[in-house]
Amino acid sequence: MTNEQISKLETAILNMEEKKSRIYFLVQDTKGNAKASVRYIYQIAKTLKDNGYNSIILHEKPDYFGVSSWLGEEYMELEHQPIEGTNLEISPDDLIVVPELYGFVMDQITKLPCGKIVLSQCYDHIFETLQPGQTWSNLGFLKCITTSEKQKEYLEGAMRNVSFDIITPYISDSFEKSQLPPKTIVNIHTKEHRDTINIIKHFYAKFPQYRWITFRDLRGLPETQFADAMKESFVSLWIDQQSSYGTFPLESMKMGIPVIGLVPDLVPSWMNENNGIWINNKTMFTDVLSDFIQNWLEDNLNPNLFESMDDTVKTLPTKEIFENEVVELFTKMFNVRKENFVIQLDKFQTIEE
């Protein structure tokens, strides 16, 4: 038995040294709709693949729609495997990364002999599919990757005995300032579609003099179409109270477009009183938008707003920084696991002698 254990440990150590260990990433099937949380996972997986690691995308069913229509064909070149109807190969040196929404999957794989990591992008989902009293550490998930310091602070209070690391999302170079004057278009991006409908109807009812203003709902568009559509506008509206990072307003700022947004429950560290028009009551949206339009038409917007937006964008990680953070974190994880395996191997070899 000891010889068998020694052989398994030696194989696991060699796999990690040669980057053969599998890194599984579970993703949601968005049925062709663009979703920032899924894009983030694919970006991490592709970065690892491009740096020699063996990253694999896991999806629930064999008829997975894929992401080529909105994210790009290069992301579908990653290896994909369905959970349903297949026996996954899992070795002790492998890692599996599961979004916080999949508590039921964590429960199912709790006994798998591999490293288990939670990827948490929305604090509002962490208890949604867990049983009462369950925690990540109960299920063998002792590490978590999240997107911001604010979310990390919240999670540390909710999930004990778990270590947390941050990989900050980056804003794609698709989002750049337009060289053309903006059109009379308002970008609107809300988590709940009913908020979009309510704001538009309320605005037109209360301010019929602005019927010539066009609202553009950007939800679900592929990234390039999203960016092309966004750059034509003169202001963006944003509602996502459960947001832990705020990708949309940052994309808007990078394009030089002011944001009127509802302050989320976890206020992101980049948000300040100067880089946007932030409100705490969504019933105020129409009035605030009307005032903004009037100031815009009169060329009376505060120039400090645009300076603060640019200053905020300068603090954001680039794609290169994001990729370095990803590679450094997973290299560190494998190094720690390899050290633990070497310690176990030394013990078994001592017993064998």
Question: Which residue ranges define each predicted feature?
Answer:
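Extended catalytic core of nucleotide-activated donor transferases of GT-like folds
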Residues: 6, 10-13, 56, 64-140
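Aromatic "clamp/platform" in nucleotide-sugar-dependent glycosyltransferases that forms part
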Residues: 241
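Short hydrophobic beta-strand element within catalytic cores of glycosyltransferases
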Residues: 258-261
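Conserved catalytic-core segment of nucleotide-activated headgroup transferases in glycan assembly
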Residues: 37-40, 44, 153-226
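Short alpha-helical segment that forms part of, or immediately flanks, the ligand-binding pocket
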Residues: 227, 250-254, 268-269
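A charged, aromatic-enriched C-terminal amphipathic alpha-helix characteristic of glycosyltransferases
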Residues: 297-352
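A short, glycine/small-residue-rich beta-strand->loop->alpha-helix junction that serves as a flexible
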Residues: 28-40
